[in-house]
Every structure is written in C-alpha cells, then in structure tokens.
C-alpha cells in the first residue's frame, strides 16, 4: 500500500477536525497545520498511509496538549454499542448462516472511523449496519476465510476502531463456536491514535474475557508490521 496525493488533504483536515472538536484557538490550529505540512513535505509517499501519518498525530497531540483527542468519542461508541450487544447476537442467531452474518456486522462496524469521517452519529452507524447485514458482500471471500480458519491452528485478529471492536468481539465468539481448536489473539494499538482501539478499550468491552488481548506496541493508525 502506498500513500496517494489525494490522501494529503484528508490527513490535514483530520488534524483540523480534531483541533476544532477540542475548541482549539485559531492560532494553535494554524501553527499545527503548518508543522503538519512541513512534516508531510519530508516524507516518502511510497510508504503506507498509517506509516506516513504516525508523526502527524504526534504533532496533533502536542499542539492540543492531549494524548487522546478522541477519548470521549471512543468511550461513547464502546458504551453505546455494548448496550446493543445482545440485539446484534440475536440477529446472528436468527440468520441461516451465522458465520457470514457475524462477519458482515464486523465489516459494517468499520464505518466508525474518525480518520475518514469527521462526524459520525450512532444513528448513522446503526442505519449502515442494518443496510450491510441485509446485502450480499460485493467481494465475498467468506467461504475462503471459513475454509482457512478450519485448517489453521492460530489466528491473530487485528482490531481497528472503538465501537467496531464490539462487533469484532461478537464475530470472535462465532469463530470460537465454529472452530474450538483455534488459538486466537486480538491485537490493538500500542497507544491512542484517532479513535483506534487500545488495551483499555478492549478490556472495557470484555474482549480480554474471551481471548488474550495484546498491544502491537505502536501508535500508527493501522498495523505497520516493521514497527510492531
């Protein structure tokens, strides 16, 4: 994966959105934006977006004087979707293909990404989830995934966003039912970045009671293997 030039405005706007969420003053936002631009001008765009922008979020945190600008958002979506966990499980139990239904919910949960959208509501998330769970997957590798899990001994499940990890938890429960032989670990970010999940988030929703949860040791908004 490489970083395309079209990614750059998005990265800058994400920093500005984070600053405005915390009601930072205009001079702070302007100075922060200048430093982000300087940082990006020195980077190799052949690297992946998570690797490229790791330093950007360090700049954002420095100017906003916080290590977790999206902390309130993360807590909100973890809490609200955890309240609906039993309803989502019922949807799965009532479906003809429980594995695929749980997978669809986990895919749909990826909409909770403040690195892509600056405004996301619970209503928007629930509407998207119900749309996706009733549609066919455009690229459907669910059978291939099922067969691979059947033949595997271990699974490293890479977590992504808060709120979304509630659906990951539900999907992992389904995987454990289908493949009790499988040894599963769930990986989260090494420190807070955007609304990505950390150890605290995984523990909050009880994922650690289901499978071992580990940190990837890095603060990029993704999994950059060479830095983990």
Please give the residue ranges for each predicted region.
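N-terminal active-site beta-alpha-beta segment that forms phosphate/nucleotide-binding
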Residues: 90, 94, 135-188
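Electropositive, gly/pro-rich neighborhoods at or near active sites that engage anionic ligands
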Residues: 2-152
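Active-site/ligand-binding-proximal alpha/beta "capping" segment
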Residues: 226-228
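Redox- and metal-dependent alpha/beta enzyme cores, enriched for Fe-S-associated oxidoreductases
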Residues: 167-217, 224
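Short Gly/Pro-enriched loop/turn and capping motifs at secondary-structure junctions
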Residues: 6, 219-221
């Amino acid at each position: 994966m490489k970083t395309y030039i079209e990614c750059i405005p998005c990265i800058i706007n994400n920093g500005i959105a984070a600053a405005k969420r915390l009601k930072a003053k205009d001079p702070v936002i302007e100075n922060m934006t200048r430093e982000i631009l300087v940082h990006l001008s020195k980077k190799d765009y052949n690297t992946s977006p998570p690797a490229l922008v790791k330093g950007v979020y360090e700049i954002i945190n420095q100017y906003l004087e916080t290590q977790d600008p999206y902390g309130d958002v993360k807590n909100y979506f973890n809490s609200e979707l955890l309240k609906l966990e039993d309803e989502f499980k019922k949807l799965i139990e009532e479906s003809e293909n429980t594995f695929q239904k749980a997978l669809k919910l986990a895919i749909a949960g990826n909409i909770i990404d403040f690195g892509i959208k600056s405004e996301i509501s619970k209503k928007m998330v629930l509407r998207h989830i119900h749309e996706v769970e009733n549609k066919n997957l455009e690229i459907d590798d669910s059978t291939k995934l099922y067969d691979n899990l059947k033949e595997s001994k271990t699974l490293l499940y890479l977590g992504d966003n808060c709120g979304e990890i509630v659906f990951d938890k539900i999907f992992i429960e389904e995987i454990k039912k289908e493949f009790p032989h499988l040894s599963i670990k769930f990986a989260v970010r090494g420190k807070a970045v955007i609304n990505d999940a950390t150890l605290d988030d995984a523990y909050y929703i009880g994922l650690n009671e289901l499978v071992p949860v580990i940190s990837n040791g890095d603060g990029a908004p993704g999994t950059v293997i060479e830095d983990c």
